[in-house]
Amino acid sequence: MAEIELHDEIEAWLDSLSQDDWERIVVIIDRLAALGSTARMPFSRSLGEGVFELRFTLGRTARRVTYRFTKDGRIILLTTFRKQRDNERHEVARAKRAADACAVDYP
């Protein structure tokens, strides 16, 4: 099982969730930890440049959590966003910037 680490944005988002949503996300994150790099669609999708997204819904809202792998196999959860067609390109670019920024702390 892969070790999961949380970027500041993910920590803040998790703290803002209701108990029910938090418990649901923990199950999703645990599944990612168990699957590691073998996670595939529809659960996970590559965004390119070593960044991936978890795909899930909370209530009736499609959400994404972006992540990357470190050289030693840890998974760093980077950003989160509500899935909308209009914002995907911007959110993918933001996730890639977060991955680049945290590569110093999590090589």
Residue ranges of model-derived segments:
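Basic, Lys/Arg-enriched alpha-helical interface segments
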Residues: M1-A62, K71-I75, F81-P107
